[in-house]
């Protein structure tokens, strides 16, 4: 079979005739047009195709070879002439020889580890450390430093079809981890597993044996996570205090067993809402995690329309140290409290409350008061989609140094009666600390917005306000109000004026950066009065 195959593909052999010879055929002319001499390409003819392929040899070496072949030979004069030995041409220095090949060895190991640490912090340890370890022994020693492997993300590559290919990729990566974990992960602190379907137990078993300093574990889109696996990890890693189960199929019994084992040291917990979330919240209400600081419950890819009934006062007693509470895109309602029941202990350490959602929710002034009546340290309040909350209810909150306030309504205010006044109550209370403000979709009148935003242009004492982000999308803000806000807030870096019906055409867009915001101010100040009429 080999001789037959060799006859099918052949390389075109050029004729020894000169290009300008009279006997040159049309075929030779086309071959020279497709692959001219010295172009670095040659032709390969098959049964039904013609391939133009690059030469494998470098052009410089080929030029030297042709120069030697074309050099005229010296004729011997007489019978005693002796042929002179052919001298090889002196090779030209290459680029690699011109550079100093030992510069990497002269860098101290501590400096090299620090440089690699900067790269790892920006892009992660893999695949950079694996490639750098092949450069030289000095670099291999630097990449093996355990401090460079404190944060690792492991995701098997998909080979072939999604089902069988993922299992093949998991087994291949697991074989590498059997050497990598005991030799590199001794100081591992943060581990993230993504898209693991069947080998989660094997990976976490290796981690429990060789990673005693693990503090954070994230399982994203992982399956077959059992209670035995999580309990084994909780017992082996005594410093583990953060667990992220966002978008993972984990049984509630496994999470409850883990919290019973490691709940006393838990600081952060991320959950995806499902029908089993109530059992996990029940463990939190029983004071299973008294030191919990961050709690996030959000919907997954498949939205669950079953409302979550949250006992607010019981959560305040079970998690008194809570600093961040996020209930994202949930349909939830607080458990009603009976008449004459005193208020709960509140969240005295709460700094961030996020109740944003894209659907109608049951958050009102009364619910907000039950959550924040004892939260003076609140810095961020996200109420996007909470159309039932009014400015009069917000101004009674005990927090005095709010920095981020989001009240945007994105497409859910249709058919609802929105407040047309009250925005000055918010800006007058928090103008000295507000850095980000979102009024998008609110129904405040032109005069009400003018009074509210005028606070940022006339701050007492000559101090500039801290406002750097302002979202007025879909509001009735006027050009004069916008220009006064920009003039009074020199640090404004984000301004959203989309769908503002009172602004002229050409200015209803998003402005990012100081230059774009100042350009908007120039257009408002220099445009004629006729152009400032609403369109």
Swiss-Prot record:
Keyword Electron transport: no
UniProt-annotated stretches for the region Disordered: 1-25, 61-99
One Pfam assignment: F-box-like
CDD domains: F-box_FBXL6
Alphabetic keyword roster: Leucine-rich repeat, Repeat, Ubl conjugation pathway
Gene Ontology CC: SCF ubiquitin ligase complex
Ranges of Basic residues composition bias in the record: 7-16, 61-72
LRR repeats: 169-195, 196-221, 222-247, 273-299, 304-329, 330-357, 360-385, 386-411, 415-441, 474-499
Domain F-box: 54-106
Summary of the function given for this chain in its UniProt record: Substrate-recognition component of the SCF (SKP1-CUL1-F-box protein)-type E3 ubiquitin ligase complex.
Subunit and partners: Directly interacts with SKP1 and CUL1.
The protein's name: F-box/LRR-repeat protein 6
Organism: Mus musculus (Mouse)
Higher taxonomy: Eukaryota, Metazoa, Chordata, Craniata, Vertebrata
Primary gene name: Fbxl6
